[in-house]
Swiss-Prot record:
Its EC number is 4.1.99.13. It catalyses: (6-4) photoproduct (in DNA) = 2 pyrimidine residues (in DNA). Changing T276P: No effect on DNA repair activity. This is (6-4)DNA photolyase. Residues 24-162 form the Photolyase/cryptochrome alpha/beta domain. Changing K263R: No effect on DNA repair activity. Residues 534-556 are annotated as: Disordered. It comes from the Eukaryota.
Length: 556
């Protein structure tokens, strides 16, 4: 029988269900939760089982190379996130092997694979971490129904988050809290605050008879159809539980930094040593337990005399994650504008050329372009950098739909998370949660206050590496002689600005004001016809304004 090592004084209760199956083994299905520490599904699967099957299913639609995509990767994910996932799986496999087990990797549609496994193996339990994402909600119903029909006990604990979103919604009268402060008030203290977390094992049950199922090792990128040189500048962040725990240990070793962490004061231009923990991709894949992270932070707060508090503290960032998970779980069509009761209905522009220029880092604004190039190369950038490019695309300059920006982030970010990504895009486009649309990030001055020399821009946009610092954020203002000396002619080597920020932001504010007025007038019940009428009005107003500008006498 395996032994458990625990790290806190009280017990974690599993609430087992009586099994009807005659098998003596368990199947643990890994999806997220790619870790050994604080993994209730793994703990329960291993208890009282003669053998255990740890399974991960590679979905070809998510993992295999798609040459038609705008960046290296599959049809669903960029290669950086796929690489991070493979590293996480290899690390998990290594940890399981040290405990007398291994990861059994399958390829195919996950629901079909799980049913085949249950048909082939005599198991009494199917264990997997509960997932609130719509994709897994639909998939899990099918798998649970089949398992239950054959007498297999299903254990699916909530362990990806601190709170069970369904419980928060129930406590709030059947609706999710729509503000951060109201969420904190309803949520209270998580149950893990005083729970013991199983952090390690001395051994795990061996794998039983595999039968006739085709099982493989964790594949390499090359085996999935990717080339070594497909992306020269890989993300510097390595996947896996081992790396997550190392990064956490290093981050929290500086208690003063943890105690004084204040989100708005981070430096978005810091890239050699990011001004934050970069724990988000490890939380996204469950390489790090959010509950263990929470306990570590609480222990530090107890040891220091003074510390920052939510929403700006490090703990506050963890609770923002909980807020978006809860809101997303309780809001139908959370990932869309249409049919989403908490989302403002806004007649966004549709301009594929502008979207592509923003996506590819070719807007003509070096601060914006450097951020997007970092995203393309690393799959990550600082949260304030994300704010800048999201604002620029939507309500700040281009007035393009937040869903289109969301899709780019969803593909490229290594920490792309369905609830958080959609929530942040609604927030930053002033479609929900945040409504002060007159507050806009300048694509020129915002980055300059953190990095006046433009080191960040020079790193990610080497075409501008020799541009004098007084022109690095506005290279189009440099005299031609300066551009020539810097080997960067604007309009030839680097694009001209696609819009003029001052006039574009003014126009965006006007459009947002009109859209807000319509939403207020219709009490949030804006339909397609209302949006079409407003779009026509805005286009007419824009045309008239353009005529007036062209009729003004030009200064000689």
């Amino acid at each position: 029988m395996q032994r458990f090592c625990v790290c806190s004084p009280s017990s974690y209760r599993l609430n087992p269900i009586t099994s009807m199956a005659t098998g003596s083994g368990s199947l643990i299905w890994f999806r997220k939760g790619l870790r050994v520490h604080d993994n209730p599904a793994l703990e329960y699967a291993s208890k009282g089982s003669e053998f255990m099957y740890p399974v991960f299913v590679i979905d070809p639609h998510y993992m295999e190379s798609d040459p038609s995509a705008f960046s290296p990767g599959s049809s669903r994910a960029g290669v950086n996130r796929i690489r991070f996932l493979l590293e996480s799986l290899k690390d998990l496999d290594s940890s399981l092997k040290k405990l007398g087990s291994r990861l059994l990797v399958f390829k195919g549609e996950p629901g079909e694979v799980l049913v085949r496994c249950l048909q082939e193996w005599k198991v009494k339990r199917l264990c997997f971490e509960y997932d609130t994402d719509p994709y897994y909600q639909a998939l899990d119903v099918k798998v649970k129904d089949y398992a239950s029909s054959t007498g297999v006990e299903v254990f699916s604990p909530v362990s990806h988050t601190l709170f069970n979103p369904a419980h928060i919604i129930e406590k709030n009268g059947g609706k999710p809290p729509l503000s951060y402060q109201s969420f904190l008030k309803v949520a209270g203290e998580p149950s893990c605050a005083k729970s013991e977390l199983v952090m390690s094992y001395s051994s795990l049950p061996p794998i039983g008879d595999i039968g006739n199922l085709g099982i493989s090792e964790v594949p390499s990128l090359e085996e999935l159809g990717y080339k070594d040189d497909e992306q020269a500048d890989w993300t510097p962040f390595r996947g896996g539980e081992s790396e997550a725990l190392k990064r956490l240990t290093k981050s929290i070793s500086d208690k003063a930094w943890v105690a004084n962490f204040e989100k708005p004061k981070g430096d978005p231009s810091a890239f050699l040593k990011p001004a934050t923990t970069v724990m988000s991709p490890y939380l996204k894949f469950g390489c790090l337990s959010s509950r263990y992270f929470y306990q570590c932070l609480q222990n530090i707060y107890k040891d220091v005399k003074k510390h920052t508090s939510p929403p700006v503290s490090l703990l506050g960032q963890l609770l923002w994650r909980e807020f978006f998970y809860t809101t997303a779980f309780g809001t139908p069509n959370f990932d869309k504008m249409k049919g989403n009761r908490i989302c403002k209905q806004i007649p966004w522009n549709e301009d594929h050329a502008m979207l592509a220029a923003w996506r590819d880092g070719k807007t003509g604004y070096p601060w914006i372009d450097a951020i997007m190039v970092q995203l393309l190369k690393w799959g990550w950038m600082h949260h304030l950098a994300r704010h800048c490019v999201a604002c620029f695309l939507t309500r700040g300059d281009l007035f393009i739909h937040w869903e289109q920006g969301r899709d780019v982030f969803e593909r490229l970010l290594i920490d792309s998370d369905w609830a958080i990504n959609n929530g942040n895009w609604m927030w930053l486009s002033c479609s929900s949660f945040f409504y002060q649309f007159n507050r806009i990030y300048s694509p020129i001055s915002f980055g300059k206050k953190y990095d006046p020399d433009g080191k960040y821009i020079r790193h990610f946009l080497p075409v501008l590496k020799d541009m004098p610092k007084q022109y690095i954020y506005e290279p189009w203002t440099a005299p031609l002689s300066v551009q020539t000396k810097a080997n960067c002619i604007v309009g030839k080597d680097y694009p001209k600005p696609m819009v003029l920020h001052d006039s574009a932001s003014k126009e965006c504010k006007r459009k947002m004001g009109e859209a807000y007025a319509l939403n207020k007038k219709m009490d949030g019940k804006v339909d397609e016809e209302n949006l079409r009428d407003l779009r026509r009005k805005l286009q007419k107003d824009e045309h008239e304004e353009s005529k007036i500008r062209n009729q003004r006498p030009k200064l000689k």
